[in-house]
Amino acid sequence: MYSYIKGKVVNNGQNFVIVDNNNIGYHIIVSNPYFYEINKEYKFFVHFHIKENLQILYGFNDNKNLLFFKKLLDVPTIGPKSALMLSETDNLEQVFQAIENNDNVYLRKFPGIGIKSAQQIILKLKGDLIFSEKIILNPKKTELEKILLNLGFVKKEIKSVLNQIDDKKELELMLKEVLLKLAKNI
């Protein structure tokens, strides 16, 4: 329904800001409302969440955080509050790494995330953070992934093998190592 709302923050509370856009005040739930200065204009990437008889806007500074939030909502044990805390962390890359490395201890540091929820997040999202691959992978690994996809390999297998190799080598040597590892999996 909404992609983003751009406007002036006119008020903030414990977990929300009120954004004035063309004389309409939007109540947007955010992780840290005190980050936003009153009477200053911001752009919020928003998710319109409908629950029973409630309609709620969740706001993010960056579209990447919004996309991750939406993916978290697909995890059965994760609700909007927990998803907001995970997706608005200062170090989103570290959350992605924790998911890719099965690190449920790191994920449990977030409020509302227990062992079951952490395991569900890893199970549901590992290898599926497509929008974040530029953060997780360096340029050589991104190039390797494109080559391997063109050769017909499956994305999940590729990501698994790419996480095992040293990215400080030449691209050709990395490709050879990846192909050998993928051949062992066949």
Swiss-Prot record:
The RuvA-RuvB-RuvC complex processes Holliday junction (HJ) DNA during genetic recombination and DNA repair, while the RuvA-RuvB complex plays an important role in the rescue of blocked DNA replication forks via replication fork reversal (RFR). RuvA specifically binds to HJ cruciform DNA, conferring on it an open structure. The RuvB hexamer acts as an ATP-dependent pump, pulling dsDNA into and through the RuvAB complex. HJ branch migration allows RuvC to scan DNA until it finds its consensus sequence, where it cleaves and resolves the cruciform DNA. Residues 134-135 are annotated as: Flexible linker. Residues 1-61 are annotated as: Domain I. Residues 62-134 are annotated as: Domain II. SUPFAM superfamilies: Nucleic acid-binding proteins, RuvA domain 2-like. Has three domains with a flexible linker between the domains II and III and assumes an 'L' shape. Domain III is highly mobile and contacts RuvB. It comes from Phytoplasma mali (strain AT). Its main location: cytoplasm. This is Holliday junction branch migration complex subunit RuvA. One of its GO terms (cellular component) is cytoplasm. Residues 136-186 are annotated as: Domain III. The gene is ruvA.
